[in-house]
């Protein structure tokens, strides 16, 4: 049976109600069974998020203790699939870098607002917080994975770049669907490592400016001198 109903997955109580409404006509399930299953899944999801954040903090502590460098490999959930990411995480660890996902450090970052875009998606918000946290820590860099098929990535890549460059940090973007050849990716990662080492060797001071976006407001006084197209 194929079913594709709308489900409010951000509301545990309402999610249980909707699942019961959709499943009970086809399956022998009671309301309490559905409610208990949703609650168990909810607890497991929270436990997963807590463990991810804890592992992120543990990895950051080890990086600093051992004097290593880390990469926040920021991508969508499907980029975790080895068939999609083409082994980029393993490539990075093979180069001596620790690899973290954006959701393992996002809870440590606070976004400088306002942003230039409308920040209305959970993944985007998590990505921007991870980028903001990266700007304040020289032992980690952010590499963003995007897929051409996802149009919203064009918005996130511009905003992440602005957040990083506002604090003088390097921005690296890898477009997953440009090919499965890791040779080009390996060259870019080696170049990034070389740039990091050169920056640290020179002890270059990063030029810092606010990452928040200053909107230009059209006032009545501007009416005589400007035209909105």
Describe every region a protein language model picked out.
Residues 1-229:
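An N-terminal assembly and electron-transfer interface module characteristic of large anaerobic redox
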